[in-house]
């Protein structure tokens, strides 16, 4: 790499046509662009699926080169209280659009972080300035947005970026950056991302910085992620009743990859879901794993909790 530009920003979509893996959403938004008008919008979905990129691309397509004059981005998780609505949002909303634009756009990222009082104030602001201003709200969980706001918005649900769409775009980035990537390295990127395109690009840039060829080993190492087959082996070993052997495998994963207890739990969950075992057994394993996850969030010792989980799996072999 010859420069220090962040690839996530360098390859951020500049138009709606460049947004990856959200075809249905983009098709609907293009209709608004053609009519040169949009309602209030609510984008919901997991991180890294293109919500922010889509909002900015929409503003570019609507307003052209001077889009920045009539677009402001705020992050609600930084300022959760009602003051951000009373001051910053109102201050921008009450000024007239610039350069002949029909309205201005306020993009509020992570809107589900706003308190209930702040959301109620936001709803009133949306009504008050609806003639000169449109709001685009972004959230991970639409259930955390109060119903009066939901009812005033067109809701767009962003899904994890599909594997093939992500693979195609990652290969394009590799070609432009002169990065050599193996097939297993590409598959590893897809796996660790979990549909989060931002995470995949960041991992690719990190891997490209430390080696001439990006392969699976590099990806798993820099992202502190175990290979799927290693995690499956851990589960199967414990289910066979080999507790001490499973414990040694856990030791190796935590030391080799530097994984935290939360990392282990998240990956165990992912592998259990995809394992070819009876649904009734999956229910048992996931139910118990949920208890471990809860205890970890409460501050319990991660090693004791993970050992206890492996011990539980080992007891199932005797039933």
Swiss-Prot record:
Record-level GO cellular component terms: DNA replication factor C complex
Any one GO biological process: DNA repair
Residues binding ATP, per UniProt: 45-52
SMART domains listed in its UniProt record: AAA
InterPro entries for the chain: AAA+_ATPase, ATPase_AAA_core, DNA_pol3_clamp-load_cplx_C, DNA_Rep/Repair_Clamp_Loader, P-loop_NTPase, Rep_factor-C_ssu_arc, Rep_factorC_C, RFC_lid
Annotated Gene3D superfamilies: 1.10.8.60, 1.20.272.10, P-loop containing nucleotide triphosphate hydrolases
UniProt entry keywords in alphabetical sequence: ATP-binding, DNA replication, Nucleotide-binding
Pfam family, one: AAA
GO molecular function, one term: DNA clamp loader activity
Family: Belongs to the activator 1 small subunits family. RfcS subfamily.
NCBIfam families: PRK00440.1
Function: Part of the RFC clamp loader complex which loads the PCNA sliding clamp onto DNA. The complex possesses DNA-dependent ATPase activity which is further stimulated by PCNA.
Subunit structure: Heteropentamer composed of four small subunits (RfcS) and one large subunit (RfcL). Both subunits interact with PCNA.
Protein name: Replication factor C small subunit
Organism: Archaeoglobus fulgidus (strain ATCC 49558 / DSM 4304 / JCM 9628 / NBRC 100126 / VC-16)
Organism phylogeny: Archaea, Methanobacteriati, Methanobacteriota, Archaeoglobi, Archaeoglobales
């Amino acid at each position: 790499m010859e420069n220090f530009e962040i690839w996530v920003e360098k390859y951020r979509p500049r138009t709606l046509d460049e947004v990856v893996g959200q075809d249905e959403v983009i098709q609907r938004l293009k209709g608004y662009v053609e009519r040169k008008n949009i309602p209030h919008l609510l984008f919901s979905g997991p991180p890294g699926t293109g919500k922010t990129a889509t909002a900015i691309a929409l503003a570019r397509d609507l307003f052209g080169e001077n889009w920045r004059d009539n677009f402001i981005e705020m992050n609600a998780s930084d300022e959760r209280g009602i003051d951000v609505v009373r001051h910053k949002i109102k201050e921008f909303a009450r000024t007239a659009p610039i350069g002949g634009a029909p309205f201005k756009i306020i993009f509020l990222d992570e809107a589900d972080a706003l308190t209930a009082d702040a959301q109620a104030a936001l709803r009133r602001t949306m009504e008050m300035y609806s003639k000169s201003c449109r709001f685009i709200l972004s959230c991970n969980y639409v259930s955390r947005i109060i119903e009066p706001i939901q009812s005033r918005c067109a809701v767009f649900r962003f899904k994890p970026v599909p594997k093939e769409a992500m693979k195609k775009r990652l290969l394009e980035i590799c070609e432009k950056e002169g990065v050599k990537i193996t097939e297993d390295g590409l598959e590893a990127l897809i796996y660790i991302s979990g549909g989060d395109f931002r995470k995949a690009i960041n991992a690719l840039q990190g891997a490209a910085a430390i080696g001439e060829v990006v392969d699976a080993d590099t990806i798993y190492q820099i992202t502190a992620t175990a290979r799927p087959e290693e995690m499956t082996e851990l589960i199967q070993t414990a289910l066979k009743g080999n507790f001490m052997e499973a414990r040694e495998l856990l030791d190796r994963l935590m030391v080799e990859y530097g994984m935290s207890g939360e990392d282990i739990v998240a990956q165990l969950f992912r592998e259990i879901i995809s394992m070819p075992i009876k649904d009734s057994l999956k229910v048992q394993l996931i139910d118990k794993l949920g208890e471990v996850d809860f205890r970890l969030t409460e501050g319990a010792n991660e090693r004791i909790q993970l050992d206890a989980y492996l011990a539980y799996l080992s007891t199932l072999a005797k039933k």
